[in-house]
């Protein structure tokens, strides 16, 4: 007798109450599988949304740099003034209660502007607590052109390392890599919340 026939015979021989329990168990397992799949789809959608958000913010920041570079090209400002004004503008643009901010490095991983790092600091050897070379990832992503990298970092004033989605773009004329990251710690919570609603 083949396995399918054996299962059919086993089910046929069960008392009606056990058949009902088996049916309810299978339905419950099916609902759980659907909920997990829905949560995963929701999670992936939220990640894509967050990636688009940070990419759009960096693109807007690149427009700011481009505007000041254009002023320098037209002679309205000298290049040093244009860079200072671009830095001041980008430093003032923060989101999510000042948690998400722009920073600028150069391709040699030296800080041009960062709210928590000294200008000129070499960051190529900087590692997150998880052992990730953060600035190497950022520089490689910007030079590849896709711009995305992921690492862990604490939120300002906290110690816990949280997942971060980061987008970087290289402004070649000035040799600047503009970067912004958003924390992704709430994405999984939102996705599971979707299944409870």
Predicted region positions:
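Amphipathic coiled-coil signal-relay and dimerization helices
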Residues: 110-116, 161
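Short N-terminal helix-loop-first-beta-strand/juxtamembrane motif that initiates sensory/input modules
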Residues: 91-111, 146-148
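A short beta-strand signature within small-molecule sensing/ligand-binding domains used
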Residues: 135, 158-169
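Membrane-interface helix-start motif
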Residues: 185-197
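Membrane-proximal extracytoplasmic alpha-helices
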Residues: 38-72, 81, 85, 89, ...
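Extreme N-terminal signal-anchor transmembrane helix of membrane signaling/transducer proteins, especially
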Residues: 2-41
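Extracytoplasmic/periplasmic sensor domains and loops in membrane signaling proteins
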Residues: 80-87, 117-156
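Short hydrophobic/glycine-rich mini-motifs in sensory/regulatory modules
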Residues: 171-180
């Amino acid at each position: 007798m083949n396995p399918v026939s054996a299962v059919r015979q086993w089910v046929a021989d069960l008392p009606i109450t056990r058949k009902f329990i088996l049916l309810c168990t299978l339905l419950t397992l099916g609902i759980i599988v659907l909920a997990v799949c829905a949560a995963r789809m929701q999670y992936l959608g939220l990640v894509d949304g967050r990636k688009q958000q940070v990419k759009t913010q960096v693109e807007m920041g690149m427009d700011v740099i481009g505007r000041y570079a254009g002023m320098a090209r037209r002679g309205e400002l000298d290049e040093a003034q244009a860079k200072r004004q671009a830095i001041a503008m980008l430093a003032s643009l923060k989101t999510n209660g000042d948690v998400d901010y722009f920073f600028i490095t150069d391709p040699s991983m030296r800080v041009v502007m960062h709210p928590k790092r000294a200008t000129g600091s070499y960051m190529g050897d900087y590692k997150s607590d998880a052992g990730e070379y953060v600035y190497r990832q950022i520089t490689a992503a910007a030079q590849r052109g896709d711009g995305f990298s992921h690492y862990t970092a604490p939120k300002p004033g906290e110690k816990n390392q949280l997942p971060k989605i980061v987008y970087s773009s290289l402004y070649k004329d000035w040799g600047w890599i503009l970067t912004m990251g958003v924390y992704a710690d709430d994405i999984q919570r939102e996705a599971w919340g979707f299944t409870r609603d």
